[in-house]
Amino acid sequence: MGKLTLLLLALLVWLQYSLWFGKNGLHDYTRVNDDVTAQQATNAKLKARNDQLFAEIDDLNGGQEAIEERARNELSMTRPGETFYRLVPDASKRNQASGQQQNNR
């Protein structure tokens, strides 16, 4: 009976070792679980970005206001008879701002 008990004990030790440290063990499970969590976070960010892009596409397809807004902001277009003004800061303020940026580096 002693040999059978020793054999069963050795089998139990081997099974426990393979469960904890072997291939597809708990270490691999926690690593894969962390990878899945990171991928889900990335997917959520990409889904939010895609939803925003689809909303912008729907807005551009549906109305003239969005097209006009993009033309004004990105291409600096104006309507006939309208004057476009661009406000530029003073040269002294620009020099001061660039000096502060260089000091921050």
Swiss-Prot record:
Residues 22-105 are periplasmic. It comes from the Bacteria. It is a single-pass type II membrane protein. Essential cell division protein. May link together the upstream cell division proteins, which are predominantly cytoplasmic, with the downstream cell division proteins, which are predominantly periplasmic. Part of a complex composed of FtsB, FtsL and FtsQ. Belongs to the FtsB family. This is Cell division protein FtsB. It comes from Klebsiella pneumoniae subsp. pneumoniae (strain ATCC 700721 / MGH 78578). The gene is ftsB.
